[in-house]
Curated annotation (Swiss-Prot):
This is Phosphoribosyl-ATP pyrophosphatase. Its main location: cytoplasm. GO terms for molecular function: ATP binding; phosphoribosyl-ATP diphosphatase activity. It comes from the Bacteria. It catalyses: 1-(5-phospho-beta-D-ribosyl)-ATP + H2O = 1-(5-phospho-beta-D-ribosyl)-5'-AMP + diphosphate + H(+). Belongs to the PRA-PH family. GO terms for cellular component: cytoplasm. Its EC number is 3.6.1.31. The gene is hisE. It is found in: Cytoplasm.
């Protein structure tokens, strides 16, 4: 399976749940609760990635990153943003990778 294929497949399952709700589906639960619940889950899972990173447990970190990706895909779908939109933006950024940007603020000052 192509590395991008799994993300597309998951995105399509999420979209299908939105359009064809299945009783008891966690994805449907998120869509029913709306943007605040989805954003809360994205925030919670992102925090768990940070904690798992500090704990130095690769398996936990991978699991938490998968949770962030899943909830982010739900958010994208909720906002009607297609994976292709994200891919296009990443491609544009990749094309600029060798171009130096104007002075950036140091990370510690953000």
């Amino acid at each position: 399976m192509d590395k991008n294929e799994i993300l597309s497949k998951l995105y399509n399952v999420i979209e299908d749940r939105k359009n064809n709700p299945i009783e008891g589906s966690y994805t449907n639960y998120l869509f029913e609760k709306g943007i605040d619940k989805i954003l809360k889950k994205v925030g919670e899972e992102t925090t768990e990635v940070i904690i798992a990173s500090k704990d130095d447990n690769k398996e936990d970190l991978i699991n938490e990153i998968c949770d962030v990706i899943y909830h982010t895909l739900v958010l994208l779908n909720y906002k009607n943003i297609k994976l292709e939109d994200i891919e296009k933006e990443l491609q544009k950024r990749n094309e600029k990778i060798l171009n130096k940007k104007q002075e950036r603020r140091p990370i510690e000052n953000i």
